[in-house]
A protein has these predicted regions:
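Nuclease catalytic cores that cleave nucleic-acid phosphodiester bonds
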Residues: 2-119
Length: 119
C-alpha cells in the first residue's frame, strides 16, 4: 500500500482541506513532516511529525522514511530529486509530476535562478 508524505513547510493553506478530503476518501496513510506545527486537519490516516529546525531536516526525514513506490508532495526540487533516486514518486502541490525525465531540468533551472539571485 502506498504511503503519502507531505513536505509541510511550504504546503499552501488553501489546499489543505482538499488534501484531507482525498486522504479520507482513499484511506491513504499520510505523514505531514515539517519543522513547525502544520495542521491539515484531523484524520486517523494522518500522522504529524515535527523535526528540528536544522536545514533540510524535514527533507532528510522524508527520504529516510519513504519506500519505493511511495508518493511525496513537495515544492522542494532537490528533495524531489532525492525521492526519485529512491524509486518513489514526487509531485508538487499543483499536481505536476517530477520524473526521471524532467527532474534534472528542474534542478538546473532552480540552480540558475539561485545563482542569479546571489549575483
Amino acid at each position: 500500500m502506498i504511503t503519502l508524505y507531505v513536505d509541510g513547510d511550504a504546503f499552501p493553506n488553501l489546499l489543505k482541506p482538499i488534501l484531507l478530503r482525498s486522504i479520507e476518501r482513499l484511506k491513504i496513510k499520510t505523514y505531514v513532516i515539517a519543522n513547525k506545527k502544520i495542521n491539515i486537519g484531523e484524520s486517523c490516516h494522518v500522522e504529524y511529525i515535527i523535526v528540528d529546525t536544522l536545514a533540510d531536516e524535514a527533507d532528510n526525514n522524508i527520504v529516510e522514511m519513504l519506500e519505493e513506490g511511495d508518493l511525496v508532495i513537495t515544492a522542494d526540487i532537490p528533495l524531489a530529486d532525492r525521492v526519485i533516486e529512491k524509486n518513489a514518486h514526487a509531485i508538487d502541490h499543483r499536481g505536476e509530476l517530477y520524473s526521471v525525465d524532467n527532474i534534472k531540468q528542474y534542478l538546473a533551472m532552480r540552480n540558475l535562478m539561485e545563482s542569479i539571485r546571489e549575483s
